[in-house]
Amino acid sequence: MTHPTELPLSPLSALQFYATAPYPCSYLDGRIARSQVATPSHLINSDIYTELVKAGFRRSGVFTYRPYCDGCRACVPVRVPVGAFTPSRTQRRMWKRHRALVATVSPLHYDEEHYALYMRYQSARHAGGGMDRDSRDQYEQFLLQSRINSRLVEFRDLDAPGGEPGKLRMVSMIDILGDGLSSVYTFFEPDDQHTSYGTYNILWQIEQAKSLGLPYVYLGYWIRESPKMAYKANFHPLEGLLDGRWNVLDPDRVELPPVDAALARAPLPGGHSGSG
């Protein structure tokens, strides 16, 4: 018989969790947000991060967090089960439209052309939000710092005559987890109108997950009230983490508490509870 002190510890047992001070919500105007943060960051390797993502966490650089807002649970972690995914007619058109793009996967690294595209994207899509003024250091801290298995993917047109690289269209950062791929951030050429690069990028990740034998693509948070998040509801089937469990989510019918309802915080994996 195994003595209780000899039982294996949860891989998260060395972590601590705390709640941040309130700050303005970046998704819902006029709302106040808080995050629950997992620390210390140097202990969060790929295996531990996989468990955290399954519990609704995300990362920004080496900062690992999940929403922990008072009176709101509008952010629903979502993922696509790639084996069951069926593209819509529109998604099939987007796939065919951009299939000539050349994807190159590499370790995270700084590239001046990537940074220039990032700044054009932020200025066009998120002007006045603060990120349109990101310095190179801020860009690197946000997207190029990672202690887990992360990759940078650039999408270009076919090489030009003479061997010059094709025009850069999109850059995506992804994490490779034990059970899937996790979309970190994607930015693309803002002057290309009606391209649906973001949709194509998710379709590409779904195909990559299939080729790697990974069952899921994690898309971060879906927020019903946020138009910027609406595209995530177009992938079927879609699973959402509600009340601590992943289940197939019907965005049109799922019963979510009103934004002002009392917060119901999901338990941490391994039996931890959040502070604050």
UniProtKB/Swiss-Prot annotation:
The lineage of its organism: Bacteria, Pseudomonadati, Pseudomonadota, Betaproteobacteria, Burkholderiales. Its EC number is 2.3.2.29. Its main location: cytoplasm. GO terms for biological process: ubiquitin-dependent protein catabolic process via the N-end rule pathway. Keywords: Acyltransferase, Cytoplasm, Transferase. It catalyses: N-terminal L-glutamyl-[protein] + L-leucyl-tRNA(Leu) = N-terminal L-leucyl-L-glutamyl-[protein] + tRNA(Leu) + H(+); N-terminal L-aspartyl-[protein] + L-leucyl-tRNA(Leu) = N-terminal L-leucyl-L-aspartyl-[protein] + tRNA(Leu) + H(+). The gene is bpt. Functions in the N-end rule pathway of protein degradation where it conjugates Leu from its aminoacyl-tRNA to the N-termini of proteins containing an N-terminal aspartate or glutamate. This is Aspartate/glutamate leucyltransferase. It is found in: Cytoplasm. InterPro entries: Acyl_CoA_acyltransferase (IPR016181), Asp_Glu_LeuTrfase (IPR017138), N-end_Aminoacyl_Trfase (IPR030700), N-end_Aminoacyl_Trfase_C (IPR007472), N-end_Aminoacyl_Trfase_N (IPR007471). The keyword Transferase applies. It comes from Burkholderia ambifaria (strain MC40-6). One of its GO terms (molecular function) is leucyl-tRNA--protein transferase activity. Belongs to the R-transferase family. Bpt subfamily. The keyword Ribonucleoprotein does not apply.
